[in-house]
Amino acid sequence: MVAAQDDGAQRKLAHTLLLELMSYQFASPVRWIETQDVVLGQYRAERIIEIGPAATLTNMIKQTVQSKFLHSDRASLLQRQLLASEKQGKDIYYEDDGVGIGTGAEAPAPSAKTQAQASGGAGTIAGAGSSTAPVTAPPAPAAAKAVPAGGMQAIEDRQAQAFEIVRTLLSRILKIALTDVVGTQSIKSLSGGRSTLENEIIGDLASEFGSLPDRAEDLTVNDLSAALQKTFTGQMRKVILKMLHAMFASKMPGQFTVATARTYLHSRWGLGSGRQDSVLLLAIAQQPGSRLKEEAEARSFFDGLVQFYADEHGLTLGANSGAADETSGLGGGLVMDQKTLAALTGGQQELSKALLKIYAKHLDIDLDGDRRALHDLQATVEKDLRLALDQIHQELGEDFTDGVQPVFSARKARRFDSAWSWALQDLLQLYYEVSRTGGETEVDLAAKRCKHIEDAADPRLLDVLQRIVGRFEQQPVLSSMFTQLAQRCRDSLLHGPRYLARPDQQGPRTTISAEGDITYTEQERAEPVPLADLVYLPKSTEAAPLEPFLHLKQRTGGSSAWTYSHDLTEQYRAVLEQATTVGESFAGRSVLITGAGVGSIGAEVLKGLLAGGARVIVTTSRFSSSVVRKYQDLYTQVGSRGSELVVVPFNQASVQDVTALVNYIYDAQGGLHWDLDHILPFAAMPENGRTIEKIDPHSELAHRTMMVNTLRLLGAVKARKEAQGSRTRPTQVILPLSPNHGVFGGDGLYSESKLGLEALFNRWHSEDWSDYLSVCGAVIGWTRGTGLMSGNNLVAEGIEELGCRTFSQQEMAQCLLCLMFNTMCSLCEEAPLYADLSGRMGAVQNLRQKVQELRTEINETANTRRALLEELAMEARCSEGPTPTIDSEPAKATATPTLTAHVRLDFPPTVDYNQEIKPLTADLQGMVDLDRVVVVTGFGEIGPWGNARTRWEMEAYGEFSLEGCVEMAWLMGLIRYENSSSPGWVDAKTNERVHDHEVKHKYEEHILSHTGIRLIEPDRFGANYHPEHKQLLHEVLIQEDFPELEVPEATAQQMKLEHGNKVDIIPDPEGGDQCRVVLKKGAKLMVPKALRLDRMVIGQIPTGWDARKYGIPEDVISQVDPVTLYMLACSIEALLSSGITDPYEIYRYIHVSEAGNCVGSSLGGFNSLQQMYRGRYMEKEVQKDILQETFVNTIGAWMNMLLMSSAGPIRTPVGACATAIESVELGYDTLISGKAKFCFVGGGDDFGEEVLYEFANMKATANTVDEFEQGREASEMSRPAASTRNGFMESHGCGVQILTTARLAIEMGLPVRGVIAFVETSSDKASRSVPAPGRGILSKAREVRSSSPSSSLISSPLLNISNRRKRLDFRKKQIEFARETALEELQLEIAHVEESEVEDYIRERTAQINAEAQKDLRNAQYHLGNAFWQNDPSIAPLRGALAVWGLTIDDLDVASFHGTSTKLNEKNECSLIQAQLSHLGRAKGNVILGVFQKYLTGHPKGAAGAWMLNGALQILDTGIVPGNRNLDNVEAELQKNEQIAFLNRSLDTGRGSMRAVSVTSFGFGQKGAQTIVVHPKYLFATLEEQEYEEYLDKRAKRQKKADSFFYRGLASNRLFELKTAPPWAPQKELETLLDPTPPQTNVDDRVARSIVQQESAEP
């Protein structure tokens, strides 16, 4: 009946039935007690499931079971399972990780208590929090015997031994392999005497085993293990369990727990719990490097450990192949695999699906309807789109559709307008070149530079020229040259820059040698004819008169034909002459050029416009850093005062780009806001080889580019001019026409494109845009060397013989530029002009045929000569016999020698005494106290470009030499030296021999890709670090109870401590150390999330750099922070750079208390800080003594412990980015005060994502994403002083210098690289900004000014070194008089001495008197030499420090700037240096050369000043002043700093020409620092000639020894000698430290022998 009813009746009936049933339910008694009796008693139900929102009924049933059925259930062994769907869904659906019965991998025999319970003893019911609630304890399963699942024969179990635990602990703590834990060694010997490690090991052993034997650290591992075994229970305890669980938590897949591993070891390998412990101990010691992702990987990992264990213990194990496929994560011996579980649950899933379909059918719901509708819609849309795209591709072709893609981006625009800076740079380069060569320089190049200097000159350039003229007073020729240049600059300042044409009068020349080689050259024409003369009509003997090579045409009457116009041509001739005489100014004009690729006619036009002062926007379709750099170089060479060049990416085939380009030019907001005066649409595309039947999509694309979109471009300009009402300033359009109207053929639609442009001549009259655009068509002739015509260069000479004139690019550019002169522009505004610049190409009949004939003739002539030569050679062979083969002796004798790399330490060259030193001795000899003069004898560096030597090659020369490539390849682990029967370099991977000359070719590309400033290479900074995936933690409150987690009991208690009642702990019913935890609703979780950082580029040390290369041992590498490793390597470099191969050598000259260390850092051991905070927080494995590695002073401590073993002063500067120069100040003060005579200084820092992130938050660093969007490469992103700079680039590494007293350096023969003349730090004014740029170092120029009107004429007489010398001479006489007086009084003194002691008394007293006299003399030298200026308010510290060496502020040649590439730093720093120089009276025009090193290295914080100081010393050494190659355009605001020259290329000033260099450094926290280093020749001038010669002899021997040691170190990777004992014998420690007498008497004999052996070693 129901079935027969319709749907409405059925719903009504169902509603009525529901109401009746609910009424019955509410009206009837519950009868819950009776229901339970029936279910539990009558039916004896074992599995009861409650479906509902809470476990209400389940809890009631539990109480009933406890009160009524507990004893009967035990008696009958009945087990009940009570489940609630709200909590135990997985158990209900059998979806848990597994179902098992048993105790673990191998269940032990049931205990007596368990057996009693199984016989009916009392059991317990699990609490309400249990996932399953067994009512009674189950009996021990029969399967839990000694037979594993799978039926495999069990292995006899054996407890883990104490030795295994001891070995595991030692392996993990010492970070060594298990095989390196030798049983016969003690803990003390294994830890290398590191007490911290010893204490950690002993503490962990005590925690694990309880009491330990006395002096456990001195027992061998075997003896210690045997002693511990006596009381060892065989159970893993606190320390090992913590390591075990940490290993599983960090290295195993999420579901692979300790219990899972035990189950697997039991089921697959039959291992009992004891042997499982042994394998787990192996896992702790040999854990994988990173987390295993799949359980299969984990099982494979444990398989390997089992095999290792079996081999170690001589076991033969057979694996149960089926066990590996079973589900993991089970706690018992019975295992239910996935197939069985699927079989159990599969029926339920099928039933659910069937019910769903029935309900859907009943409700008339189509379950697949929406999916089908969406699929049909998607298919329809996709089909239509695909059809449309296919039609477009078929119609237009792939070349066309790809070729019209837009590329324009206003963000990528590059602007160049700092011509003033490049003019000064050209002037300085010209000056130093003529100074070095005595005036012998390339004439043409000098003339071009002079023209550029003239065009771009500003008033300060005149001051520089005036000073240069003064320096060449004794050289009349050079003085005259610069005087004339100065006059032309003055004229240019009066009249403005002008374009002046000086094209080369050269013609084409094709020659064919006797060997048949074809050569094309440009040679001076035999009869040069100026371009202006090419407009004259030639004499014609033909019936039809010939037109001039260059002429203008006009229309006659109403005809559309163009004919020669004498009047217009005469006007054109006048401007051609004007171009070579007075020129033309383009100042104030705005020009657009498309198609001005380097080497094109457009590029030459661009040069002329820039030389004339125009603003030009040029487009390029191949926008890249290399292309932009070519335009930058072009502007640098020719840009004049007021000119500007803008380069943008642009595809003229794209309509979108045409619109965007014009908008960018005219828009005031975000654009240039220009109104164009000229447009040169020169963009073209070659179409070679395309005849009429081969017109293809490329031809259409070219036609669109050269004609269609040219018209669109002009239309867009017209629209913008009309919109802004610009009717009185029409834009001149130079249309690039062609005489090739199909004459050549085979060039696609090229001629049609050019002919199409000629229609504009008529449209100018017929349309409404003549007020906005004027038109000048230029028929461009045969131009040699362009992209379109370079292939025809060989026939150009022959073409000229046919009566056609060919042009160079410069000549054609002049012709076109003259069309833009004011005269021609005025003519264009009246009517379109037609300029025929074809050189009468159209007059040559059958041009294509003629060209082919010429080409054929050339090739035939060449082939004939080659054949003739070959025939002659054959005749010679036949008449003279066989020629020698390549293997014959003569051939070998004449083989070209291969290049050999001479990698060596860069000792500075010796200074010639007569030429460079002697002229200074008159003032300086004997004028300073050498014990209080501080010199730099050596330096080291680890940075993005390797060491200091390789960094200098890139900084000074822009490329690596062969030696630089060899050293970098060694440093990066690409090659190694093999000492075999045939020693030499071999490839580190293939072991193939690599000759020296092959290294650069083979490895340079790889080296350049993995050095310098580049995208972050995550592998260097931790396995889980990537800048695009910075991990952060997000706190959440969970909304429902989590599924159970299996964790160690200790972890569970810790979670309980943190979360309180939000955590339920379910103990393991078998009493194991694992338990289950339920995180309840409301618990707090920290969920990892990732942040995409936009700082992805930094300066990084070379990929592959490894401290092992220096011989630093593995135990040190594993112990110390990377910054310490950098500092150790730097210290080794610095020592070798000083010629010191064994640091203990210095103790033959000074006491151990006189060697100091002042190295510092801004952050210290940053990697260790990360581990200490993040690693500990995340419970990663971290060494126990990590705290000590975080201290800044630990770096210097390791240097002393492993290298120096000194007892001298140790001071640790922390000055942020100014740390290194602050370190120099500390070292300087330490030496000047006499506390030390030898000192390490410098700084170092590492990189970390935390610092990167925080600098980004401060907006201090450049945004990498923005930089890439602007078209910058990684290497360009640090641009100090550039107008587009936008933040610094982080970097890392370290730098070290060795400072000594001058006397020690001379005594030891150490190389003197520079004198520290001055170094001080300064704080700043009141502020609230820690990183604000400081002004404090201005105080280094402080001095009292006289109130006299002529105060500039008054200065302290002490500044005159002659005055000081007179005073010193007088003081010397006083000292000598005092000494003589004391010696005379000695006779009175001995009257009171016993006769037997008189001789000794006289000798000792005489020595004392002489020593006092020497001390007085040194004090006099110091106070009248080194420190005469100190505490004198009338002498500025900078002025006084220079005056010590006879120098003035005008002798400060170079300033090395901190230059971080931030907006504020350069403005502040440059203004500071400018203020210092001006205040101290530096002469006008005497510019200081600015160096901005961080463009190359990035900003390494603590190491910054050290790298800059190293560079400053290299400048003094070589005379090369490096340019800032990333300085594409100097910020306009920096132009006001008239005393500073900003360079973007290196200047070679000549070796020995640099006198003093300033280095400034600034750090967060008000740290400002400045130091001045002076050339060592000024120090040598204080010595007698004999002293200097003796010093050179010592230095030469030292250099020879150091080079030999360095060669051997490179070959053996042993540049570092680990010091294991101090330089004195153990029994002499007290004597050595307390006795200040000559230290060599206390140096250990073994050390002395080592030094002697090194000195006698052959190189």
Curated annotation (Swiss-Prot):
Active site, renumbered: 1217, 1458, 1499
Recorded superkingdom: Eukaryota
Membrane-crossing segments per the record: none
Biological pathway: Secondary metabolite biosynthesis
One example of a Gene Ontology biological process annotation: long-chain fatty acid biosynthetic process
Record's keyword terms, sorted: Fatty acid biosynthesis, Fatty acid metabolism, Lipid biosynthesis, Lipid metabolism, Multifunctional enzyme, NADP, Oxidoreductase, Phosphopantetheine, Phosphoprotein, Transferase
Catalytic activity: acetyl-CoA + n malonyl-CoA + 2n NADPH + 4n H(+) = a long-chain-acyl-CoA + n CoA + n CO2 + 2n NADP(+); a fatty acyl-[ACP] + malonyl-[ACP] + H(+) = a 3-oxoacyl-[ACP] + holo-[ACP] + CO2; a (3R)-hydroxyacyl-[ACP] + NADP(+) = a 3-oxoacyl-[ACP] + NADPH + H(+)
Entry-linked InterPro entries: Acyl_Trfase/lysoPLipase, Fas_alpha_ACP, FAS_alpha_su_C, FAS_alpha_yeast, FASI_helical, Fungal_FAS, Ketoacyl_synth_AS, Ketoacyl_synth_C
Assigned GO CC terms: fatty acid synthase complex
Subunit structure as annotated in this protein's UniProt entry: [Alpha(6)beta(6)] hexamers of two multifunctional subunits (alpha and beta).
Protein's recorded name: Fatty acid synthase subunit alpha
Native species: Emericella nidulans (strain FGSC A4 / ATCC 38163 / CBS 112.46 / NRRL 194 / M139)
Organism ancestry: Eukaryota, Fungi, Dikarya, Ascomycota, Pezizomycotina
Gene this protein is translated from: atnF
